């Protein structure tokens, strides 16, 4: 189909340069751009990964899992929660 559109001069220069670099027509470059705009590629799902354990694992001795303050202190390497604030 033949049609007339108005586009920015700078954009036209970019399209024309891309067409020249790729050995295609301006119409083909514009058609591809419109198709991609109307039907963008679907994002691919991230591949699964596995966390590799390091060290001997397990709980750090003396950390009370029922206390948020104790957990925060353990995560901050002994610095008290009040000192972090």
Swiss-Prot record:
Name of a matching Pfam family: RHH_1
SUPFAM superfamilies reported in the protein's UniProt record: Ribbon-helix-helix
Region listing for Disordered, in residue ranges: 37-60
The protein's name: Antitoxin VapB43
Record bears the keyword Kinase: no
Keyword annotations of the record: Toxin-antitoxin system
A single BP term in Gene Ontology: positive regulation of growth
Stored CDD domains: RHH_CopG_NikR-like
GO cellular component: plasma membrane
Function field: Antitoxin component of a type II toxin-antitoxin (TA) system. Upon expression in M.smegmatis neutralizes the effect of cognate toxin VapC43.
Record carries keyword 4Fe-4S: no
